[in-house]
Design a protein with these regions (language model features):
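Short cysteine-rich clusters marking metal-coordination/redox-active sites
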Residues: 51-54, 71
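Eukaryotic cytoplasmic intrinsically disordered
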Residues: 127-159, 217, 239-276
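Structured beta-rich ligand-binding regulatory domains in large eukaryotic signaling proteins
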Residues: 77-78, 83, 181-216, 235, ...
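Tryptophan (W) side chains
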Residues: 2, 19-21, 28
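Canonical pleckstrin homology
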Residues: 173-179, 212-262, 296-302, 338-398, ...
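Canonical RING-type zinc finger of E3 ubiquitin-protein ligases
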Residues: 56-66
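Disordered regulatory linkers adjacent to lipid/PI-binding modules
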Residues: 159-161, 260-322, 328-329, 333-352, ...
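Cys/His-rich, Zn2+-coordinating zinc-finger modules
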Residues: 34, 38-47, 72-155
Length: 404
């Protein structure tokens, strides 16, 4: 899906599912059986490519009008824009001489220079593991709308102000209702209103503490977005979607733009490369585990857990507006660690695969249903514990309010 040089990293636009032909043949020797005229035209270019940095699935497809190689998943997206991209199977279809020569003359660098010359630093570049919506809109923005070759088409997410209606899940009744949202960089806030003519917002979400991540499976809609912000130092979840995929991705990138401009002011010496990873974040791990209370004599209860950076939150339901409790997980140097299993004295019936989180204040006993889930959670916890804490994270730790 990505269109980048084979040797570049993701932040520089590395390819997730789109490849230069020389790298394809070098990285996947199984394709060497293809007709000589299709693989020989770029043999002289292979030495300059580093296929070891490639990511994503085998590129068995190609857009012969754009000159890029793509995986099966992205080939379906390209087929939906036939006026721009025409797709063939690398293995199964017949290639004409002119098509082969065009593929040889293109490649990632040429395509990037044409279609990605003006990608804003805040614009989210999806990877092969991102949801269908992000990958589709990235492809359409590049090739169909040509937003990154014509900056005037970036206004929907670059203007610093955005207003519109989104379907929002009710905090208490769980129903999705149309609500007016206003994003204003000048005020540093995202606001929503219960009525279109309301003068006062129902909620004000400060850009400083706001995050957005697509959660289509959890929300039950392919365009579902989870927005979180801090309210009284506790995390508040807002679940929204729009029927138009472009609208939803424009909202997402507008939020990232607002975060980017806020951080530029807050950290004037930081480079774009330093700021971009802080614009939005996906959760390190999510899923059901069982937990017991602070006395560790209470029965284990099934809860939905979310690991958001250093915040471990648990909910009765995945779509709850507020967490039942939050735990700050610091670094090993600050007295935090994670242990495989539960203490021998643990009481009550629980799932068989235990995890013990040790903090300076107490131990948290958790249990997973399967060994693979336990391994995934242990890996997520250890990544956080092994990472040194930043100065601002000590401040968060000091003011953290834990709800047992």
């Amino acid at each position: 899906m990505w269109l980048g040089t084979a040797a570049s990293g993701r932040g520089a636009g590395a390819s997730g599912c789109e490849w230069p032909w020389g790298a394809v043949l070098t990285a996947w020797p199984g394709l060497q059986h293809l007709p000589v005229r299709l693989r020989g035209c770029t043999r002289s270019r292979r030495a300059s490519l580093d296929p070891g940095r490639l990511q994503g699935k085998d590129p068995d497809w190609a857009s012969y009008t754009l000159g890029v190689f793509i995986c099966l998943s992205c080939s379906g997206i390209h087929r939906n824009i036939p006026q721009v991209s025409k797709v063939k199977s690398v293995r199964l279809d017949t290639w004409e001489d002119a098509q082969v020569e065009f593929m040889a003359s293109r490649g990632n660098n040429v395509a990037r220079a044409t279609f990605e010359s003006k990608v804003p630093p805040f614009y989210y570049r999806p990877s092969a593991s991102d949801c269908q919506l992000l990958r589709e809109q990235w492809i359409r923005a590049k090739y169909e709308r040509q937003e990154f070759a014509r900056p005037e088409r970036q206004e929907p997410y670059s203007a610093g102000y955005r207003e519109g209606f989104l379907w929002k899940r009710g905090r208490d009744n769980g129903q999705f209702l149309s609500r007016k949202f206003v994003l204003t960089e000048r005020e540093g806030a995202l606001k929503y209103f219960n009525r279109s003519d309301a003068k006062e917002p129902k909620a004000i979400m400060k850009i400083e503490h706001l995050n957005a991540t697509f959660q289509p499976a959890k929300i039950g809609h392919p365009h579902g977005l989870q927005v979180t912000f801090l309210k009284d130092n506790s995390t508040r979840n807002v679940f929204v979607y729009h029927e138009d995929g472009k609208e939803m991705v424009d909202w997402f990138n507008a939020l990232r733009a607002a975060r980017f401009h806020y951080l530029q002011v807050a950290f004037p010496g930081a480079s774009d490369a330093d700021l971009v990873p802080k614009l939005s974040r996906n959760y390190l791990q999510e899923g059901y585990m069982e937990k017991t209370g602070p006395k560790q004599t209470e029965g284990f209860r099934r809860r939905w857990f979310t690991m958001d950076d250093r915040r471990l939150m648990y909910f009765k339901d995945p779509l709850d507006a507020f967490a039942r409790g939050e735990v700050f997980i610091g670094s090993r140097e600050s007295g935090y660690t994670v242990l495989d299993g539960l203490p021998p004295s643990t009481q009550g019936h629980h799932w068989p695969h235990g995890i013990t989180i040790v903090t300076p204040e107490r131990r948290f006993l958790l249990a997973c249903e399967t060994e693979s889930e336990q391994r995934a959670w242990m890996e997520a916890f250890r990544k956080v514990v092994d990472r040194p804490m930043l100065p601002q994270e000590y401040a968060v730790e000091a003011h953290f309010k834990h709800k047992p």
